[in-house]
């Protein structure tokens, strides 16, 4: 500390002799006054660790006086007085899921299993994915009550004991579904029902009057087949779907020759780990071999889910847009040639 470097100063020694005597600083020492100078030179290390010279009480007194003396020296001889700051306690914060997510360029999480990794990364934001319409598993009102409406029709001649509304499990599911989908559930009524079956039968009759006829909403098998065929034709014509194909060995060879020394720029965007990158560097000094090894490692990591579209996206994100454009053109050319063969 600063006051130790100034201990040998004559002004401080004069101050010490005025403030307290030698006997008070070193009780029972029985030595000459130059002991004080020697003690200060060694920062009291020798004297404080000598148990023969001090008893416990004298030692505690010495420590107390020495601490007081240190404060006075600091306040009198230092240019700036010592300032003390309060210790700030760390604020406890609840861990959020985002704290554990991988901060990689495209935020892809590697679960450790190929299928789990694919399922987890179907959507970048899982909370937003839960709001998608495709995640809505509750059936449509018409589909849910289709069976009950058919059984309620007198022309079908279904006996009451065989109707679905008599099933207690179906009844409770129907009540929950009506509370979610139908406005009739919360409308007041003057009718009184003895049991749940009578209430559900009344609700089914109301819905049968409001919903469209069954023939209008159900399509024939021929119409469905025609729509499936049209969808297949559109799928074959779509360039986006054509790009969503596994990468062949020829494309890897072509991309390897173009990638060359830029393979290390692309590696982080293909979610290649640092340990794998170091292993690729040790594999060979040839840049083309390293680039090929990178693409092979990426194919092994993605498994059956590696596609040309994913590779093009990684190339664009890494700034290698010229290679991405070249790969896109090659893909479109191959798709065009295949279409000529089939037509």
UniProtKB/Swiss-Prot annotation:
Its main location: nucleus. The modification N6-acetyllysine is found at residue 8. GO terms for biological process: apoptotic process; mRNA export from nucleus; mRNA processing; RNA splicing; signal transduction. Residues 13-31, 60-79 form the DUF1725 domain. The keyword Nucleotide-binding does not apply. Pfam families: Death (PF00531), efThoc1 (PF11957). The keyword ATP-binding does not apply. There is a cross-link at residues 86, 258, 273 (Glycyl lysine isopeptide (Lys-Gly) (interchain with G-Cter in SUMO2)). It comes from the Eukaryota. The gene is Thoc1. Component of the THO subcomplex, which is composed of THOC1, THOC2, THOC3, THOC5, THOC6 and THOC7. The THO subcomplex interacts with DDX39B to form the THO-DDX39B complex which multimerizes into a 28-subunit tetrameric assembly. Component of the transcription/export (TREX) complex at least composed of ALYREF/THOC4, DDX39B, SARNP/CIP29, CHTOP and the THO subcomplex; in the complex interacts with THOC2, THOC5 and THOC7. TREX seems to have a dynamic structure involving ATP-dependent remodeling. Binds to the hypophosphorylated form of RB1. Interacts with RNA polymerase II. Interacts with LUZP4. It comes from Rattus norvegicus. Component of the THO subcomplex of the TREX complex which is thought to couple mRNA transcription, processing and nuclear export, and which specifically associates with spliced mRNA and not with unspliced pre-mRNA. Required for efficient export of polyadenylated RNA. The THOC1-THOC2-THOC3 core complex alone is sufficient to bind export factor NXF1-NXT1 and promote ATPase activity of DDX39B. Keywords: Acetylation, Apoptosis, Cytoplasm, DNA-binding, Isopeptide bond, mRNA processing, mRNA splicing, mRNA transport, Nucleus, Phosphoprotein, Repeat, RNA-binding, Transcription, Transcription regulation, Transport, Ubl conjugation. The modification Phosphothreonine is found at residue 220. The modification Phosphoserine is found at residues 215, 238. This is THO complex subunit 1. An intact death domain is needed for apoptosis. SUPFAM superfamilies: DEATH domain (SSF47986). Expression is altered specifically during apoptosis and is accompanied by the appearance of novel forms with smaller apparent molecular mass. Polyubiquitinated, leading to proteasomal degradation; probably involves NEDD4. A motif (Nuclear localization signal) lies at residues 92-108. GO terms for molecular function: DNA binding; RNA binding. One of its GO terms (cellular component) is THO complex part of transcription export complex. Residues 248-331 form the Death domain. Residues 211-221, 231-244 have a biased composition (Basic and acidic residues). It is found in: Nucleus; Nucleus, Nucleoplasm; Nucleus matrix; Cytoplasm, Cytosol. Belongs to the THOC1 family.
């Amino acid at each position: 500390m600063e006051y130790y470097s100034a201990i040998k100063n004559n002004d401080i020694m004069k101050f010490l002799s005025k403030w307290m005597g030698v006997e008070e600083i070193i009780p029972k020492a029985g030595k000459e006054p130059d002991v004080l100078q020697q003690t200060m030179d060694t920062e009291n290390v020798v004297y404080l660790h000598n148990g023969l010279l001090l008893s416990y009480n004298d030692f505690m007194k010495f420590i107390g006086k020495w601490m007081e003396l240190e404060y006075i020296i600091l306040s009198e001889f230092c240019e700036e007085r010592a300032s003390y700051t309060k210790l700030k306690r760390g604020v406890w914060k609840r861990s959020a899921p985002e704290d554990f997510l991988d901060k990689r360029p495209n935020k892809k999480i590697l679960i450790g299993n190929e299928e789990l990794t694919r399922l987890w990364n179907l959507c970048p934001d899982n909370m937003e994915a839960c709001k998608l319409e495709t995640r809505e598993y509750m059936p449509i009102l018409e589909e849910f009550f289709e069976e009950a409406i058919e059984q309620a029709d007198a022309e079908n001649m279904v006996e009451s004991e065989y109707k679905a509304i008599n099933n207690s499990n179906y009844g409770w599911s129907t009540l929950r579904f009506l509370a979610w989908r139908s406005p009739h559930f919360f409308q007041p009524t003057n009718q009184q029902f003895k049991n749940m079956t009578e209430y559900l039968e009344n609700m089914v009759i109301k819905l049968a009057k409001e919903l469209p006829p069954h023939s209008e909403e159900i399509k024939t098998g021929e119409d469905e087949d025609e729509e499936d065929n049209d969808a297949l034709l559109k799928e074959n014509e779509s360039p986006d779907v054509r790009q969503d194909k596994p990468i062949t060995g020829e494309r890897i060879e072509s991309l390897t020759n173009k990638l060359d020394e830029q393979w290390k720029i692309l590696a982080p965007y293909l979610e290649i780990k640092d340990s794998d990158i170091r292993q690729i560097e040790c594999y060979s000094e040839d840049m083309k071999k390293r680039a090929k090894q990178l693409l092979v490692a990426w194919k092994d990591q993605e498994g059956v889910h590696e596609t040309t579209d994913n590779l093009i996206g990684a190339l664009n994100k890494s700034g290698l847009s010229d290679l991405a454009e070249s790969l896109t053109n090659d893909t479109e050319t191959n798709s065009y040639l295949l279409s000529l063969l089939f037509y």
